[in-house]
């Protein structure tokens, strides 16, 4: 069989330096004089960055309180005992009293922390309907199967929001009070609850369905709240810009954590007389205790924290840089010893 010139050249690449692999190239020769300085320079750079990150993290002030309510740990233990073994424990209130001997430098962020809570579980992580959370009316009425068993209520109504993540929404609440003078009255400290969610989540991923006759409640008519919720999603807040699927607390909770111990932002303290931080004095945190954690062996903590240019307190990144830098330096010394030892042997062989 004879091929024509046209057939032979039909699939040939262009005769260019790029397609014919004739581009100029350079391949470094990794000799000891090149590799050893690279290891030492990389190690010093990592150690320098690690020290900066570590000391920056250590400079962040934190004040934390475990209010799980284990027996004998404070007045929250009464609330924990009252809700033991119940899916929906009765509302209960407790308080945390503390004093600050000096200014707690701001801005101050208020977090809640949960332990032994695996939001990274595969079945838990996919138990949501992103189309429903984006406000699509069709998805509101027809949640995806991944939401099961929190897809439809016992009456057959679609659950909004559906899924295990939404059903386990953290629902404790806090208020902060300050006693400026010993024996004086407590004054409530304003907690800024706005802007605590990621901008892309609040403005892009989470949207409410279209209003019906100007009412969000009518838009959710024919749906049911998750089983563990005490009220429907459109009553999460009296603020129309912070209720429904765009409620800040809800949006923060729906961004799942990668580790079983995690923190989520609850509020910022940056208004009025507290814009520079928390002044010295006595404080009281009123806690509405709703969220049960003892059933799965977890703990819940309340944390006041300042921040730095790198964010909140996190020594892991600095330690990781220090470890990598130290390994680079150690590897460099090992390679240097090997090079010196075998270089002498090579010189003897050449002679």
UniProtKB/Swiss-Prot annotation:
GO terms for cellular component: endoplasmic reticulum; Golgi apparatus; phospholipid-translocating ATPase complex; plasma membrane. Glycans are attached at residues 75, 213, 286. Signal peptide: none annotated. Its main location: membrane. The keyword Transcription regulation does not apply. One of its GO terms (biological process) is phospholipid translocation. GO terms for molecular function: aminophospholipid flippase activity. The chain crosses the membrane at residues 34-54, 316-336. Residues 55-315 are exoplasmic loop. Residues 1-33, 337-351 are cytoplasmic. It is a multi-pass membrane protein. InterPro entries: CDC50/LEM3_fam. Pfam families: CDC50 (PF03381). Component of a P4-ATPase flippase complex which consists of a catalytic alpha subunit and an accessory beta subunit. Interacts with alpha subunits ATP8A1, ATP8B1, ATP8B2 and ATP8B4. Belongs to the CDC50/LEM3 family. Accessory component of a P4-ATPase flippase complex which catalyzes the hydrolysis of ATP coupled to the transport of aminophospholipids from the outer to the inner leaflet of various membranes and ensures the maintenance of asymmetric distribution of phospholipids. Phospholipid translocation also seems to be implicated in vesicle formation and in uptake of lipid signaling molecules. The beta subunit may assist in binding of the phospholipid substrate. Can mediate the export of alpha subunits ATP8A1, ATP8B1, ATP8B2 and ATP8B4 from the ER to the plasma membrane. This is Cell cycle control protein 50B. The gene is TMEM30B.
């Amino acid at each position: 069989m004879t091929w024509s010139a046209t057939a032979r050249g039909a699939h040939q690449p262009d005769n260019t330096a790029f397609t014919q692999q004739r581009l100029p190239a350079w391949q470094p020769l990794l000799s000891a004089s090149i590799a050893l300085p690279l290891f030492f320079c990389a190690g010093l750079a990592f150690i320098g960055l690690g020290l900066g990150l570590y000391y920056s993290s250590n400079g962040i002030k934190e004040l934390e309180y475990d209010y799980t309510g284990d027996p004998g740990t404070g007045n929250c233990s009464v609330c924990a005992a009252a809700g033991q073994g119940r899916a929906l424990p009765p509302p209960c209130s407790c308080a945390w009293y503390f004093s600050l001997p000096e200014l707690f430098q701001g801005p101050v962020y208020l977090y809640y922390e949960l332990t032994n809570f695996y939001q990274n579980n595969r079945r838990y992580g996919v138990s949501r309907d992103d189309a429903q959370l984006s406000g699509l009316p069709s998805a509101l009425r027809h949640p995806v199967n991944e939401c099961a068993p929190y897809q439809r209520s016992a009456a057959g109504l679609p659950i909004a929001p559906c899924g295990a993540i939404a059903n386990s929404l953290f629902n404790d609440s806090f208020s902060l009070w300050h006693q400026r003078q010993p024996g004086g009255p407590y004054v409530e400290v304003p907690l800024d609850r706005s802007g605590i969610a990621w901008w892309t989540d609040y403005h892009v991923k989470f949207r409410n369905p279209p209003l019906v006759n100007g009412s969000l409640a009518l838009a959710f008519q024919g749906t049911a709240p998750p089983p563990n919720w005490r009220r429907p999603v459109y009553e999460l807040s009296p603020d129309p810009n912070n209720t429904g699927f765009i409620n800040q607390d809800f949006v923060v909770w729906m961004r799942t954590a990668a580790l079983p111990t995690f923190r989520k932002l609850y509020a910022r303290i940056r208004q009025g007389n507290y814009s520079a931080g928390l002044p010295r004095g006595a404080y009281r945190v009123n806690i509405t205790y709703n969220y049960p954690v003892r059933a799965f062996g977890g703990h819940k903590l309340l944390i006041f924290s300042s921040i730095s240019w790198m964010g909140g307190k996190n020594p892991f990144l600095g330690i990781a840089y220090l470890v990598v830098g130290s390994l680079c330096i150690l590897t460099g010394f090992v390679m240097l010893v090997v090079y010196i030892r075998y270089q002498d042997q090579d010189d003897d062989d050449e002679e």
